[in-house]
Amino acid sequence: NGRQDPGEPGAAGVRVIVGAFTSLTDSTGRYHVWDIPAFERVLVQIDSTSLDNPLYVPAFTTASVQPPPNAYRRLDLPLVTGAVLEGRVVQEGAPVSNVTLVLTNTSSGKQTSLATFGDGTFYVLGVKPGRYTLEVDPRDLAARRLVGQTLVFTAEPGRPDQLSNLVLEVRAAAR
């Protein structure tokens, strides 16, 4: 849920990047970085390649902090369980290969592009909780003279397998 609940363990061995410095979390999920210049903004982020579970994703990409002088500042970096998004693109039941799909988080507007495989299937690991749309890239539709549907769905926290077997249908455009 993006918050450490009582009794929930911290994530150990996660690389945290603080400006030009890095630190690994200890067995409780805590990390420490020293000698950060006071009053200067610094970006803090989790190196997602250091997470031991590929479904864990940082709740936010980066945090910008401005540390005070001679003081300790706590900054929690929450992880959430992402979903697996998988399905196929079809035209009259036949797979549509090598098309670009656009996954859009409707809250943030952030877009992610992905391509279908040769058999028309697609797969994305670690989709953050939220409301999304998925559609074939309009440029691909225009180039192939197709029209397509837009899927609207919600990725819910803690349910990684909820977005399986999605079917995105396209059809020939009217002339």
Describe the role of every protein-language-model region.
Residues N1-A11, G87-V99:
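Structural motif
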Residues Q4-P6, G10, I17-R30, T106-T121:
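Short, acidic Ser/Thr/Gly-rich low-complexity loop/linker segments typical of extracellular
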Residues A11, H32-L43, D47-S50, D119-L141:
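Short Pro-Gly-centered beta-turn/loop motif in secreted/extracellular proteins
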Residues V14-V16, V99-N105, L134:
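Hydrophobic beta-strand segments
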Residues L24-D26, P37, P68-N70, P78-G82, ...:
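Surface-exposed coil/turn segments at beta-strand junctions on protein surfaces, enriched
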Residues I46, T81-Q91:
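Beta-strand-rich structural segments
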Residues S50-R73, R139-N165:
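Structured interaction patches on ligand/partner-binding surfaces of diverse proteins
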Residues P68-A83, N165-R175:
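Conserved "repeat-terminator" motif of extracellular CCP/Sushi domains
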